[in-house]
Amino acid sequence: MSNPERMFVSIVTVTYNPGELLEPTMRSVAEQVGVQIDYVVVDGASKDGTVERLRAFGEQVQGELVQGQPVHGGSLVFRWVSEPDRGLYDAMNKGLVMAQGDYVLFLNAGDTLAHPRVLADLWSERKGAAVYYGQAMVVESMGGRELGLRKPLPPQHLNWRSLRFGMVVSHQAFVIKRERALPYDLQYRICADIDWMIRCLRALDPGALGPEVVSSKALGVHFADRVLVHFLDGGLSSQRRKAAWKERFLIMSRHYGPLNNLLNHGWIVIRYVLRRFVPNFA
């Protein structure tokens, strides 16, 4: 049973042969204080020792200390499964089914929460929001050096229309009520996350089918103007990047209409060029 004085959140990590990347992610989850956590790891039958790491973590989470205080005191539940799946988004759907928290957050292997009170602070600022979102810091995959804030920066106000210019919020910095979290559409192999976020936000918006714009506050969407997560820089290959652009274009045409999407992508291309050549362009 959840405690109304604490956020009860399911953190879902999907893995396949993550190697040593999984351990800092699990550690950052275990270090969270002031929050009730249901931690779910969905592994795709890894062959690199991941199962052994999961077993070891399950044995050690009880009694770990952070700054001399019990990390969870019984408020962390850890569950995992390791079995074949049909890809990343199929595994994420499994995680949604397994999740028992009031909220859901997806955290990749190698990604870490910014500090031990990052989730508790969200709840202190605003209890019961439908969505919480914030900034993400990109870190180097080797060594963990901070490379800068993920861009584009998230908007001050977020609704489903905000994503017409691309993925303006990192999914690792997006916490949504579990009852509002729709399944991922498995027809998309690379960019199902932006389709998912658009559909989840659109379902919150009573004016989604009309011209009126509803404010983030009215939708129950809370913006935390700070870093919530550190995530690994892992660029796509050039071939996969082309496939991602094509798939994303189809997704956004579906949601915003072909002509509007074509015009929106004009700005996306301009923004991409400016970001490469103009220092500190957001």
Give the residues covered by each predicted segment.
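Short, Lys/Arg-enriched charge-dense amphipathic segments
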Residues: 63, 156-160, 212, 244-255, ...
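Catalytic core of nucleotide-sugar-dependent glycosyltransferases
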Residues: 226, 231-233, 238-260
